[in-house]
Amino acid sequence: MPGDKGRATRARMVQTAGVLFRRQGYDGTGVQELLDRSGAPRGSFYFHFPGGKQELAVAAVADSAMGIAKGIEVMLEAHDDPGQAVGAVVDLIAADLERSDFRGGCPIAAVTHDTAARSDEVRAACRTAFEHWQGLLEARLRRAGWSLAAARQEALVILAAIEGGITLGRAARDTEALAAVARRCRSTLGSAAPAVG
């Protein structure tokens, strides 16, 4: 069992992997670059991740997903109106994308694109992350009076729109797509739950 220093080294590698995956994907990130950027000792990678880069990816996906979830939760709780709450989440994501000079996308999507066809463990970690975020959106809509089925479907549509907006934003180097998603959320979610669903 690693001591405090070992846990700190492992945590640095996981966090660094999340940043690198976000900017350059799983395939574009090498172990040596990870060690160099994290400042981890050369022999420490396989000590902490005997399953190799895939094991690291599972840990980095979980870590990144939890960090993003915390930001989502803060925004969802900051507004009484669900449309304003979800719009604020999208605004936060757009600001983060712009701050990264459109180099940083969703770390979970980046890893999914690179690994889904070849690693069930990494794919499962990515799916869990997306399902968690969808669950946060769904729970917020449920608190606003949406039925379970309607909230679940709307949360899935919102998540898909956000992920698509990030991709379009990186390609166009602007936040127009995400701004459109935020506007749509604000205008269609509103404070009233849908009549059917």
Sequence positions of predicted segments:
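Helix-turn-helix
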Residues: 12, 16-59
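Hydrophobic alpha-helical connector segments
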Residues: 73-104, 155-158
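Amphipathic alpha-helical segments used for helix-helix packing
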Residues: 57, 84-88, 99-124
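Hydrophobic alpha-helical bundle segments that form small-molecule/ligand-binding pockets
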Residues: 79, 118-120, 130-155, 192-197
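Hydrophobic alpha-helical segments that form the core
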Residues: 109, 148-168, 180, 184-188
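All-alpha amphipathic helical-bundle segments outside canonical DNA-binding/catalytic cores
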Residues: 84, 124-125, 143-159, 173-176
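N-terminal intrinsically disordered/low-complexity leader segments
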Residues: 1-8, 193-197
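Amphipathic C-terminal alpha-helical segment
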Residues: 96-99, 117, 139, 159-177, ...
